[in-house]
């Protein structure tokens, strides 16, 4: 059975790429979610007035990869302590978020947030600012075609490398 999870972890170009090679991930796309404006576009989202987040939609086969393993990639490939930014990318659209489609995902998201937060706290980092939201309450708006699989189309394109360097415990 496939499940869908939505994550915000900074610029969606590089974030989407992190999930391409995971066994069990059957589809990814990028879009906007979590805001108040209907049918937003990139230009509008970048103004910071829509409250939308740049999102990676991940469809995965739960018999091949667990929600925890998908979220391990999420936590370890951005800095969830930075609030409305990732590296040099600043704005509310770059904030850290997990939008869950069911109770199991929400439970795993909350547990891994707590576990990763303990690791980061022990290392002296700031608290995690990641929002955990119900995806069913926030429409996912597919981003423009030129954003989809951006780093395949533009192999030398921008890929934010902000992360903490710490691992989620097993």
Language-model region placement:
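Flexible coil/turn and secondary-structure edge motifs
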Residues: 1-170
């Amino acid at each position: 059975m496939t499940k869908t999870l939505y994550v915000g972890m900074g610029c969606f170009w590089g974030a989407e790429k992190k999930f391409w090679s995971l066994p069990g991930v059957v589809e990814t796309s990028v879009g906007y979610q979590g805001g108040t404006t209907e049918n937003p576009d990139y230009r509008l989202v970048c103004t910071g007035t829509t409250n939308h987040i740049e999102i990676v939609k991940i469809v995965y086969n739960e018999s091949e990869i667990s929600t925890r393993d998908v979220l391990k990639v999420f936590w370890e490939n951005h800095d969830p302590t930075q609030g409305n930014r990732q590296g040099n990318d600043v704005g509310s659209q770059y904030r850290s978020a997990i939008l869950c489609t069911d109770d199991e995902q929400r439970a795993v998201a909350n547990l891994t947030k707590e576990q990763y937060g303990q690791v980061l706290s022990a290392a002296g980092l700031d608290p995690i600012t990641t929002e955990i939201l119900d995806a069913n309450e926030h429409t996912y708006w597919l981003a423009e075609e030129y954003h989809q699989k951006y780093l395949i189309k533009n192999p030398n394109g921008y890929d934010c490398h902000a992360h903490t360097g710490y691992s989620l415990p097993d």
